[in-house]
């Protein structure tokens, strides 16, 4: 660390002294990893879903009902963690051991409860996600399966939109979207999020 005269050193804040000392030692506290930014695939899917939502309400003659859904980093992170066993194994279908399943459920239930608390209600977020055969807290074999290949049109997209719409309520303003590539195939995972906090 370069020499500082005593008067200058004493005027530094505590944080500045720590930072300066660390810089002199060649080290420093590691910053937490930044949340993953949405990919172009995910942004394109959000745009396509909003376009389908607009068409839906226009066809019903209720354009005033339309609300544009926004990308939610919280819900997207939940989706990413939810399907991580498949992504890590690079397999669309995985079978966990009972121990792995129990640990995974505990972690995801903690994440779920934290988001429900943050957004004001147990109705803010469901125990599952669209695009994955696995539901937290329900008896099942220890299996997880990605079910919806990525598409912006066609039957897969239409069915996904219908399922998303059925999950939505009047407080749904945001979507979590995660589009992993697993075993060479792109998939889509969607999490509707309802913000029920009192504003």
Regions found by a protein language model. Give the residues of each.
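Protruding loop/beta-arch "assembly-hinge" segments enriched in small, turn-prone residues
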Residues: 30-35, 193-197
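N-terminal secretory signal peptides and thylakoid transit peptides that target proteins
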Residues: 1-20
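Short N-terminal secondary-structure initiator segments
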Residues: 3-4, 37-40, 198-199
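Short, well-ordered surface patches within globular domains
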Residues: 33-115
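A well-ordered secondary-structure block
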Residues: 102-199
């Amino acid at each position: 660390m370069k020499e500082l005269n005593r008067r200058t050193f004493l005027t530094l804040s505590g944080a500045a002294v720590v930072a300066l000392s660390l810089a002199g030692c060649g080290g420093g506290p590691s910053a937490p990893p930044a949340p993953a930014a949405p990919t172009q695939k995910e942004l394109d899917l959000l745009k396509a879903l909003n376009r389908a939502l607009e068409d839906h309400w226009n066809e019903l003659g209720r354009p005033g009902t339309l609300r544009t859904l926004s990308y939610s980093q919280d819900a997207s992170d939940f989706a990413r963690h939810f399907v991580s066993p498949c992504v890590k194994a690079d397999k669309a279908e995985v079978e966990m051991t009972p121990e792995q399943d129990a640990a995974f459920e505990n972690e995801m239930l903690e994440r779920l409860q934290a988001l429900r608390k943050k957004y004001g209600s147990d109705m803010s977020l469901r125990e599952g996600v669209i695009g994955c055969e696995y539901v937290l807290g329900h008896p099942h074999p220890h299996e997880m399966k990605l079910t919806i290949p990525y598409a912006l049109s066609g039957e897969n997209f239409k069915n996904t939109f219908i399922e998303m719409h059925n999950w939505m309520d009047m407080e749904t303003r945001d979507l979590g979207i995660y589009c992993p590539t697993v075993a060479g195939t792109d998939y889509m995972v969607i999490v509707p999020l309802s913000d029920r906090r009192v504003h």
